[in-house]
């Protein structure tokens, strides 16, 4: 998963229209190169991959902590009292993973995520992706989800 992360770091100085540089002659890494929310979302994709390929929760937790340096030793009960709406992935993805790690089912994972407060839809979206890969999604909830999407 380092390829996408390095791509994010290399592309970061050129993000947004006013920074675009449409040539190939640029330093691959500079002082302006840094990871962005794209790297953090890549972590979420990595966790979904691990869940989909049959890794256990302890294996997923260990991989994320060792590879990405996230502290996943907090509990939902510890997060809830002080957590608030944060628009950075760095303060959303770990909490979403913790909501999954503490869950016992797909629905429980979503309830954990929303119960943290903060950016509830983003938390539940990330947690839902991981939980679906790990537990599967009940058909009734799948049907309800599809009903709420536009046909086009």
Give the residues covered by each predicted segment.
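Structured, active/binding-site neighborhoods that engage oxygen-rich ligands
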Residues: 1-152
């Amino acid at each position: 998963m380092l390829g996408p992360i390095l791509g994010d770091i290399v592309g970061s100085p050129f993000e947004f229209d006013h920074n675009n540089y449409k040539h190939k002659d640029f330093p691959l890494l500079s002082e302006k190169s840094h990871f962005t929310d794209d790297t953090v979302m890549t972590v979420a994709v990595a966790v979904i991959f691990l869940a989909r390929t049959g890794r256990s929760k302890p294996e997923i937790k260990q991989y994320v902590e060792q590879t990405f340096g996230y502290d996943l030793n907090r509990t939902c009960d510890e997060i809830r009292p002080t957590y608030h709406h944060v628009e950075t992935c760095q303060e959303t993805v770990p909490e979403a993973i913790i909501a999954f790690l503490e869950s016992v089912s797909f629905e429980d994972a979503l309830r954990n995520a929303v119960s943290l407060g903060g950016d509830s839809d983003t938390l539940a979206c990330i947690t839902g992706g991981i939980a679906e890969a790990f537990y599967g999604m009940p058909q009734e909830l799948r049907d309800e989800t599809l009903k709420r999407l536009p046909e086009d």
